[in-house]
Amino acid sequence: MNIILSRDSQVRVMEDTVTNAEKSFGQFCSLLAAYTRKTARLRDKADQLVKQLIDFANTENPEMRATLRNFAEDLAKVQDYRQAEVERLETKVINPLKLYGVQIKQTRAEIKKFKSVRNNEIKQLEKLEKLRQKSPSDRQTISQAETSVQRASVDASRTSHQLEETVDTFQKQKLKDIQKIFSDFVTIEMVFHAKAVEVYSSAFQTLESYDLEKDLEDFRAKMHGVYGRYDARPPLMDTTLSPALPWSLAQSAQSTIRSQRKEAVSEDDSAEEDPVEDLRGQAQRLNQ
C-alpha cells in the first residue's frame, strides 16, 4: 500500500504540472495572439495615415509637398517592418503555442492510462484482502489472487516508469520552449524597433529640414498673383517699374514670376502620380 500511496503522490505532481502548463500556455497564446492582432491593426491605421498624408501633400506648396511625401515614404517603410513583425510573431510565437495543445493532450492520455492500471492494481489488492478474510483456508484461490496482484503490480510499476519518463520529457521540453518562444518574441521586437528608430530618425530629419519661409513666400506670391491675372496688360507699357509703385508690390510681382517658374517645374516633376505602394509586398524581403 505504501507503494500505491507513493504512486498517487507522484501522479498528482504530474497532473499539476500538465494542468499548469495547459492553463499558462493557453493564456500566453491568447494574449500574444491579441498582441499580434493589435499590432496588425496599428499597421493598418498607419497605412491610412500614409494615404492621408499623400492626399494632403498634393494640396500644398512645393516645399511642404516634398517634405510630406518623404515623411509618408518613411512612415510606409516602418509599416513594412511592422508587417514583417506580425508575420514573425505568428510563425515563431503563436504557432508553437498553439501546437502545445497536442503535446498536453498526449501527456494527459498517458496519465489517464497509468491511473487505469493503478486502479486495477488497487482492485486486485482489495480482492486479495477480502479472500484472506473470508476464506483464509482456500489456498488455491488466494494463490491465484496473489498472482493477479503481482501481475497488476508489475504492470503498474512498468507504466509508472514510462509515465515518469514521459512527464520528465514533457517538463524539459516545456522549459526549453518557454525560453525559445520568449527569446524569439524579444528578438522580433528588438529587430522591429531598431529598424523603426532608424527610419523615424530619417523622418525627423526630413521634418526638421522643412523650409517654411520658401512656402510662405510662394503662398504670398500666389495671393498677390490672383489679382494680377485680372489686370489688362496695357499696350507699349514701359518695362521699368514706376518709382511711384509701392516697393512691396514690386517685390510681389518679382516673387510671382519666381513662384510661377517653380510651379511649372514642380508640376512637370509631379505629372506622374506616385501611387501608394502595396506595403504588404515588401514583407517577404524583410523576412529573408
Curated annotation (Swiss-Prot):
Residues 133-157, 256-288 are annotated as: Disordered. Keywords: Cell projection, Cilium biogenesis/degradation, Cytoplasm, Cytoskeleton. The keyword 4Fe-4S does not apply. One of its GO terms (cellular component) is ciliary transition zone. Residues 6-217 are annotated as: BAR-like. GO terms for biological process: cilium assembly. Residues 138-157 have a biased composition (Polar residues). InterPro entries: AH/BAR_dom_sf, BAR_CBAR1/2, CBAR/FAM92. Residues 266-276 have a biased composition (Acidic residues). It is found in: Cytoplasm, Cytoskeleton, Microtubule organizing center, Centrosome, Centriole; Cytoplasm, Cytoskeleton, Cilium basal body. May play a role in ciliogenesis. In cooperation with CBY1 may facilitate ciliogenesis likely by the recruitment and fusion of endosomal vesicles at distal appendages during early stages of ciliogenesis. The BAR-like domain displays limited similarity to other BAR domains. Homodimer (via BAR-like domain). Heterodimer (via BAR-like domain) with FAM92A. Interacts with CBY1. Belongs to the CIBAR family. This is CBY1-interacting BAR domain-containing protein 2. It comes from Bos taurus. The lineage of its organism: Eukaryota, Metazoa, Chordata, Craniata, Vertebrata. The gene is CIBAR2.
